[in-house]
Amino acid sequence: MASTSDIRNGLCIKFNHDIYKIIEFLHVKPGKGPAFVRTKLKSLTSGKVLDNTFSAGHKIDVIRVETHTFQFLYPEGDEFHFMNAETFEQISLNKNILDAPDLLKEGTNVMVQINTETDLPLSVDMPASVILEVTYAEPGVKGNTATNATKNATVETGANVNVPLFINEGDKIKIDTASGSYMERVKE
């Protein structure tokens, strides 16, 4: 058992008969009253995000996890297949456990957290950004550049992304996996 002073981002805990990953936390010590910790928890079984407040010194049940590098192989319905980069063992994960399944390209390396007690995958950390090719881009209308004008584009994985007007089919773009937004055009 750990206490609230051990809370950090990425920590996996057992709480309310479910397994959660701490996304954000803030230690608060008000002028009046006891200290507490505000947390944002993501359920690793359902993917729902929950706000919770722990009082200072509250005991939390930490789950031991190991992190391994896996390579994305292919999607099959709601299942996504990965291969361990070290042991070449293959696993399939439901798309609910992934943050941005529509941005996964074959060969992308991800970090998978595995519960050491049950050997079940808990969560998948995507790379911070991915580089994908634009397969379809709406034509940009000239004269609409007074403000930050954007248009819809489809990338090779099938995801839709808002991009600036100068992006055309065949361009490679860098996409932020956390927000799914356009970052920059990549020159080869």
UniProtKB/Swiss-Prot annotation:
Keyword set includes Protein biosynthesis: yes
InterPro entries listed in its UniProt record: Elong-fact-P_C (IPR015365), NA-bd_OB-fold (IPR012340), Rib_uL2_dom2 (IPR014722), Transl_elong_fac_P/YeiP (IPR020599), Transl_elong_KOW-like (IPR013185), Transl_elong_P/YeiP_cen (IPR001059), Transl_elong_P/YeiP_CS (IPR013852), Transl_elongation_fac_P (IPR011768)
Pfam families per the UniProt record, alphabetical: EFP, EFP_N, Elong-fact-P_C
Listed GO MF terms: translation elongation factor activity
Gene3D superfamilies on file: 2.30.30.30, Nucleic acid-binding proteins (2.40.50.140)
Superkingdom, taxonomy of origin: Bacteria
Pathway where this protein functions: Protein biosynthesis; polypeptide chain elongation
Location of this chain's protein in the cell: Cytoplasm
GO process annotations (BP): peptide biosynthetic process
Swiss-Prot/TrEMBL keywords: Cytoplasm, Elongation factor, Protein biosynthesis
A GO term from the CC aspect: cytoplasm
SUPFAM superfamilies named among the record's database cross-references: Nucleic acid-binding proteins, Translation proteins SH3-like domain
HAMAP family: EF_P
Function: Involved in peptide bond synthesis. Stimulates efficient translation and peptide-bond synthesis on native or reconstituted 70S ribosomes in vitro. Probably functions indirectly by altering the affinity of the ribosome for aminoacyl-tRNA, thus increasing their reactivity as acceptors for peptidyl transferase.
NCBIfam families per the UniProt record, alphabetical: efp, PRK00529.1
Protein name per UniProt: Elongation factor P
Gene: efp
